[in-house]
UniProtKB/Swiss-Prot annotation:
Its cofactor is [4Fe-4S] cluster. Its EC number is 2.5.1.72. It comes from Shigella boydii serotype 4 (strain Sb227). Pfam families: NadA. It catalyses: iminosuccinate + dihydroxyacetone phosphate = quinolinate + phosphate + 2 H2O + H(+). One of its GO terms (molecular function) is quinolinate synthetase A activity. This is Quinolinate synthase.
Length: 347
């Protein structure tokens, strides 16, 4: 079947980088945010890919730094009446779907995700309609509208286990939106998977030849790879996994030097986990080429201290996440299935 929208050829305009803050400005906004969090009965929920100073602030204020699955769990269970989600838009939507009674704020509602942008709901609905015999599994990196069409939502940390489970039931799968993660899961499980053709603009840029040269330069290094990366990069890995799984692998691998193929925002928590190990960025620019993302999501970078302070101070349409109630109820069903399934895996 042909699909009118082609994620492979889509070019997403990057947002402007936030204006760098001085040391004094950073100190001012840090103290202001801490005060506003207390006044608003709010807690910060930050993704591993946000900048280190944002993750540090979340730690210092009793918040959460995690992958998207744990962000969802933490936000739903925390008693705070307001969640400040430092991440990208779908993460704020997911928080609102799971916690409709809470106020969900984001530093900016313009923080997108190329996987989300690469899966427009109208085209995706048509794709699903053309394959009515397939169970629809969508990655967490999708809009509320796409989640509402799905049977299951999944994160990379439990993707293999879920598809293995569905395959054991004889179910055929539509997987969206990440083609690389879909192919990785298919290879691991042998499941019958029909993939949407989206990709993460960060992980899609990792280059095999450049990584090979870096490996030759550091032959004692282990390679850690997120499965949103191209198959050729995954094939070079000593460990493959979600952000939380890569941090765990960094601790268990005996190597003292690690080449990391995911967004460099992860280095903050990974270095905490292995303070005695050297972390190297996997290359995103090939021979004679330049990188666009350069191993850091440009939309994650929009979560700066000034924007967080403004979100807590101003609230309003520029910062508060809203999800249509009927859409929220439909999207909640596959999200709850994911959380229930994840709970069974934890025993």
């Amino acid at each position: 079947m042909s699909v009118m929208f082609d994620p492979d050829t889509a070019i997403y305009p990057f947002p402007p980088k936030p204006t760098p803050l001085s040391i004094d400005e950073k100190a001012y906004y840090r103290e202001k945010i801490k005060r506003l969090l207390k006044e608003r009965n709010a807690v910060m929920v930050a993704h591993y890919y946000t900048d280190p100073e944002i993750q540090q602030l979340a730690e210092e204020t009793g918040g959460c730094i995690s992958d998207s699955l744990e962000m969802a769990r933490f936000g739903a269970k925390h008693p705070a009446s307001t969640l400040l989600v430092a991440g990208v838009r779908f993460m704020g939507e997911t928080a609102k779907i799971l916690s409709p009674e809470k106020t969900i704020l984001m530093p900016t509602l313009q923080a997108e995700c190329s996987l989300d942008l690469g899966c427009p709901v109208e085209e995706f609905n048509a794709f699903c309609d053309a394959h009515p015999d397939r169970t629809v599994v969508v990655y967490a990196n999708t809009s509320a509208a796409v989640k509402a069409r799905a049977d299951w939502v999944v994160t990379s940390s439990i993707a293999v286990e879920l598809i293995d489970h569905l395959d054991s039931l004889g179910e055929k799968i539509i997987w969206a939106p990440d083609k690389h993660l879909g192919r990785y899961v298919q290879k691991q499980t042998g499941g019958d998977i029909l993939c949407w053709q989206g990709a993460c603009i960060v992980h899609d840029e990792f280059k095999t030849q450049a990584l090979t040269r870096l490996q030759e330069e550091y032959p004692d290094a282990a390679i850690l790879v997120h499965p949103e990366s191209p198959q050729a990069i995954v094939d070079m890995a000593d460990a493959v996994g979600s952000t939380s799984q890569l941090i765990a692998a960094a601790k268990t691998l005996p190597h003292q030097r690690l080449i990391v193929a995911t967004d460099r925002g992860i280095f903050y928590k990974m270095q905490q986990a292995v303070p005695d190990k050297e972390l190297l960025e996997a290359p995103t620019a090939g021979e004679g080429a330049t990188c666009r993302s350069c191993a850091h999501c440009p939309w994650m970078a929009m979560n700066d201290l000034q924007a967080i302070a403004e979100a807590l101070e101003q609230e309003g349409s520029n910062h508060e996440v809203h999800v249509d109630e009927r859409l929220r109820e439909r999207a909640l069903v596959p999200l709850n299935r994911m959380l229930d399934f994840a709970a069974t895996l934890r025993g």
